[in-house]
Amino acid sequence: MLNPIVRKFQYGQHIVTLETGIMARQATAAVLTSMDDTTVFVTVVGQKKLQTEQKFFPMTVNYQERTYAAGRIPGGFFRREGRPSENEILIARLIDRPIRPLFPKRFFNEVQIIATVVSLNPQVNPDIVAIIGASAALSISGMPFLGPIGAARIGYINNQYILNPNVNEIKSSSLDLIISGTEESVLMVEAEANMLTEEQIINAINYGHEQQKIVIKNIEHFAKKVKIPVWEQCLYPVNDDLEKRIIEISEQEIVKAYNIFDKVIRLDVLDKIKSKAIEIIISEYSGIDEFEITSIISNIERKIVRNRVLKNRIRIDGRNKDEIRTLDVRTGVLPRVHGSALFTRGETQSLVSVTLGTSRDAQNLDELLGDKTDNFLFHYNFPPYAVGEIGMVGSPKRREIGHGKLAKRSILAVMPKLDLFPYTIRIVSEITESNGSSSMASVCGASLALMDAGVPISNAIAGIAMGLIKEGDDFVVLTDILGDEDHLGDMDFKISGSKKGITALQMDIKVKGITNEIMKLALYQAKNARIHILNIMKKSLNVPRKDISIFAPRIHTIKINPEKIKDVIGKGGSVIRMLTEETGTTIEIEDDGTVKISAVMQEKAKCAIQRIKEITAEVEVGSVYTGKVTRIVDFGAFVSIGIGKEGLVHISQIAHKRVDKVSDHLRLHQEIFVKVLEVDRQGRLRLSIKGAK
């Protein structure tokens, strides 16, 4: 017998429904979550038995969109969904980020969350629904999940904050912010903004956090109705004696190691300390594996680093809390590339290239919310050599896709409109060195490379990553964090923008109690850092170059009569194909008669434009044209006076005297002058040679 448990509540302009007990009853937990007609089915499965060889938390989140949800059949040969799209990967990360910190540190049981979109209202984005569903499913799973969490999308329209704006409203909003957190704390923020101030962003976060508490309360009521299975103690045990012994062996040496500011030398010393500790412990204890030893050493490192920052205000590399690493900015570093920059911040370095293409190079996206074309691409690559490691090289991982999306959002607000700069633009960031904040280095490098390419961006953009060390009421906000400060700290807060305002931010918080004061301090400290970086960037390249690269295609736009499009294309595309081959250009025609001609060489583009003008020109009766004989027949000759325009010179119009044989007066391909005598209703031309003399 199926016994559904249902909870409905009003959430902004939408009705949210949580339902369990009907489907996927063999899963640890399953919740059908709806916001109006957008429905996401979320399942959670957890392995109660701990695999002894597992020494990490193996949680995976899969988000998948089914095309039947939108009443469509997938494209492609197989007519079924394939590997995850970029959008699916990004939403899976959105679900993962606020959930992962809410599991205990030593919980290593395998967990899988699958969120499947099964119904779609085109006006309701399923990402918020998926986060709410995952929170509800985990809350009734019996796992040691320290939730529930809520989630909200916040827009900013006409100086008003909007809770969960629909898809159309987002298009006119100057803010698209997603927030997720518990009753007490914000855990995750992801935002794209159009030059908003720090105060506006803070208010949006506060508004969103307050509103999402409605979700938390309703999930708590929902969970009370469900018979939740009780999990036995499943945390990996702590060996106190072992911890004391390792502290005796290693603590003082680790303290000395962290007096070394050079990362490579410091890591080499720390590796030797770990190896020594492992050797001693294995000889003294039986049944102890390396993970237990290195885990304890990592905790010792964490305490040492955090204490140095909180008590002595000394960071790992010796900087002050608000000090930025040494910057090195170079542009035009790749000679044949349309635009390039090398941005170095300490031990983090990004090589950024910009390529300009035509609308044919745009990416066609087959998304659940509808098909669209993207003329701005941003790809982020993180090879293993960037951190001195050996690893697999291949298709981008989730992290690379996420960082690329953040960098793209950072730049989007300053990109020129397509009608002003009709290029498809691809930015690629190659991370050649990394010690924290590589995505923000990509933003800075991208801004410089765009200006080097002559792209008329409205403002230069810079990005900075902020961190936090917090113990009780004592805290320090760190500017331009290192990789270790991110790993050992309590917050990763990336902010990008111009001198005018913020364009994007991403915040992940690992602890409770992040106050308004802390967030405000982080935002304003980041603003100072951003302005400092922009001033350094300005010295290298202040404004976009006046012209694009000589190696980039020039795009020329002309307008023709839409009724003449068929003449330019020709039968089966014959005319446009001949034009592109003969002139070496790319020609694109839109339904409204807009024609875009692109070529690297200016002369070729001018030639193509002239030919198109000839084809589309209106033939005037009584005018004389240069023509070429294309066919000779018994009753006259056909003469072309332009591509697609051919007329008949009757035998009686060849000469003033009688003509018995046409070939006695004309030959094939002969150039002659002809006068237009008539254009009939079907557009056919009657020409005269004798009238042109």
Curated annotation (Swiss-Prot):
EC identifiers of the protein: 2.7.7.8
Location of the S1 motif domain: 622-690
Domain of life: Bacteria
GO BP terms: mRNA catabolic process; RNA processing
Cysteine pairs bridged by disulfides in the record: none
Gene3D superfamilies: GHMP Kinase, N-terminal domain, K Homology domain, type 1, Nucleic acid-binding proteins
CC terms in the record's Gene Ontology section: cytosol
Cofactor: Mg(2+)
Entry-linked Pfam families: KH_1, PNPase, RNase_PH, RNase_PH_C, S1
The protein's role, per its UniProt record: Involved in mRNA degradation. Catalyzes the phosphorolysis of single-stranded polyribonucleotides processively in the 3'- to 5'-direction.
Family of the protein in this entry: Belongs to the polyribonucleotide nucleotidyltransferase family.
Name by which UniProt lists this protein: Polyribonucleotide nucleotidyltransferase
